[in-house]
Amino acid sequence: MDRLKTFKRIMEKSDSNRVIILTNHYQIKGNVYDCGECNRDEFINLTNVRVCNVIDSYDGICDSESSFDWLHINIDKVVAFSFV
C-alpha cells in the first residue's frame, strides 16, 4: 500500500483530521483537507496550518511559528505523524 493511502487509512481509524507532521526540519500542525478533485497522489493537503522549526519545538515553545491557510506537503518528506 502506498504511503498516502496508509496515511488516510490511519486518519480514518483515528477519527480525527487534526495532525502533527514532522519532517527533517519542521513540525507542522494542521487539519487534513481531503478534496477528491484537488488531491494529488504525492501530497497531503492541510488547512489552518502552523509551522515551526523542529529545533525550536523541542521545548514545547516555538518562537518563530508561521501560519498558513493552506499547505501542501509531499508525503515523501514526512518522517513521522500523529493524529490528535
Which role does the model predict for each range below?
Residues 1-84:
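Conserved RNA-binding domains used in RNP assembly and mRNA/RNA metabolism
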